Amino acid sequence: MDTKLLDILACPVCKGPLKLSADKTELISKGAGLAYPVRDGIPVMLESEARTLSTDERLEK
């Protein structure tokens, strides 16, 4: 995924910023507590496709 997209993409649920996961397979929204998958370099920005972050993941910086 092109990291330049992070400058313009926002979480569709909370409208907050997104962060690319360390393994580059998810876009993380701390505000919504969701992780959106990145498939074949394309972010899937659907709430129904996102997974809920664990408590530990929400507390990470």
Swiss-Prot record:
GO terms for cellular component: cytosol. InterPro entries: Trm112-like (IPR005651). Pfam families: Trm112p. PANTHER family: PROTEIN PREY, MITOCHONDRIAL, ZGC:162634. Belongs to the UPF0434 family. This is UPF0434 protein PSPPH_1629. It comes from Pseudomonas savastanoi pv. phaseolicola (strain 1448A / Race 6) (Pseudomonas syringae pv. phaseolicola (strain 1448A / Race 6)).
